[in-house]
Amino acid sequence: MIQDAFWGILIPFLGTSLGAGCVFFLKNALRDGIQRALTGFAAGVMVAASVWSLLIPAMEQAADLGRLAFFPAAVGFWLGILFLLLLDHLIPHLHQNSLQAEGPKSQLQRTTMMVLAVMLHNIPEGMAVGVVYAGYLAGTAQITAAGTLALSLGIAIQNFPEGAIISMPLRAEGMKKGRAFWGGVLSGIVEPIGAVLTILAAGIVLPALPYLLSFAAGAMLYVVVEELIPEMSQGQHSNLGTVFFAVGFSVMMALDVALG
């Protein structure tokens, strides 16, 4: 089980690293249409993962509360939203295709704030992977080895385009290929760190697992609504983003049902 958790935590990070490696093979920055499609796909995966892999298991684990089984999921969900809202105000960052940075005023370089934006985005994904593996290691009936693998694979699939989305613009900003690659890799390092910390926290307070599952869901959905949906809806390719949102949602849903 420990070995399963190790690889489950590492797989999403490998997805980001492989995506960042696109900077060595693609000469030009990603076209707007491709960026919209990749962003929409990532958003679809995250929404499906939030529902099938996090919120539903959270309510199933609280089934002994009867009609109040929704309560832990609702509380954790709102705490996740508020946590990301707080980070959004505390960390200076710059979203893709945005001219104005968010968060406190900072003298950080534009490229650094772009990496910070993706790192902020990746925090809830690492927490999501960590909390499902915490449930798996604890022997929770609602969380299976196949289900945890489905979530890891789904996050890894959507991390691949994210790695490219950060490394290619860094290259377009004038950064050398090697540094742009490591910038993409660095943006994903928070995921395994967040996963390990979440596993440790869940191990200490196992009865709070339903709250932690829904906390991760709330944090992920905050990122989708605040960042990904606006990015995929800009410009002339918004329909493409919507179509690939549906593709990403379907892929993650199929993975969870087929493997879970």
Q: What are the residue ranges of the model-derived segments?
A:
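Intrinsically disordered, metal-sensing/regulatory segments
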Residues: M1-G260
